[in-house]
Amino acid sequence: MLRNSYKKLLEDTRKYYKNLKKIRCKHIENDLIIFGDSGFSHLLIKDRKLRSIDEQFRKLCLVQYIPQIINNDGIKKETRIIQSKEYGQIEYIALSGNFDNKIVKIILRKLGNGNYHFWSIMDK
């Protein structure tokens, strides 16, 4: 039973995520956020290993909050920049807000001069 509900959640969330494609974000000067395969894969995999089913389930359930976080006022923004030999500058932006009595945070990533793309989501 749990396996079937996980499979349905995975399929439904994948369809929802693919429909997001690109969204302008007022918290990063109206730049586009790209919703590509790497971001969705990161919901399921970390450090080249599958996340636990519980962690995947939790992250998949949070995907519905992405548009609200990107477009709402009252969102907290944190930025971190690191240097990489492979990509040059990597910028991570965390946007978080309170939804349904929990803090939901999305991570955006920008490699070098590329576009921002969705990287992860979590709750506290």
Protein language model regions, located:
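Ribonuclease/tRNase effector modules and their secretory precursors
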Residues: 1-124
